[in-house]
Amino acid sequence: DDTWEVIQRAIAERQHASPMELVALQQPGKGKADAVRVGFARATGDVLIILDADISVPPEELPLFVRALDDDRCEFANGSRLVYPMEAKAMRFLNILGNKFFGYLFSYLLGQPIRDTLCGTKVLRRSDYDRIVANRDFFGDFDPFGDFDLLFGASRLGLKIRDVPVHYKERTYGETNISRFSHG
């Protein structure tokens, strides 16, 4: 697998055109939650963004998330793939049912409407993330993807969570590492 080399070349080719420093990190652990934690620890900005690398959510939609924070509509912007119609092969039927179930369950448990707990696109302020991390021991380290950890943590802190609808597309890069049955 030459993924790391491809990433290094892509950064070298694009760094001069980017207004931001482009950084690639190799995580010491496994899973998305570990990758997000490593990335957030290295990030220098006041706003932290999670966007899955398969680009099934267009990065052009990220300003909607940041605007939701800036306009004080929320303190935690959570992507929802279950609002707009999605491409035919973007999500399997059982995954749609599971995502809807978790949305109803979390809405009930957290007392805030949440349609899609497992959308990979999430945005929050660093100060709020740092508070979630400081309270992480309360729920434990049970979530290999980090979505539930962030949502439970945000709710426990009383943060206003708001869904931001996204246009979910079929994955065009790579293959999923998530098993519908062993990962839920």
What are these regions (language model features)?
Residues 20-22, 27-42, 47, 59-140, ...:
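Acceptor/aglycone-binding surface of glycosyltransferases and processive sugar-polymer synthases
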Residues 2-6, 51-68:
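Acidic donor-binding/catalytic loop of UDP-sugar-dependent glycosyltransferases
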Residues 1-25:
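Acidic donor-binding segment of Leloir-type glycosyltransferases
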Residues 139-140, 151-169:
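Catalytic donor-sugar/metal-binding loop of nucleotide-sugar-dependent glycosyltransferases
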Residues 5-8, 37, 63, 152:
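Active-site phosphate/pyrophosphate- and oxyanion-stabilizing loops and adjacent acidic/basic residues
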Residues 39, 54, 125, 154, ...:
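Residue-level signature of catalytic and energy-coupling elements of molecular machines
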Residues 25-28, 51-53, 164:
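Cofactor-binding loops of NAD(P)H-dependent oxidoreductases
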Residues 7, 105, 129, 150-154:
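Structural element of the ATP-grasp superfamily
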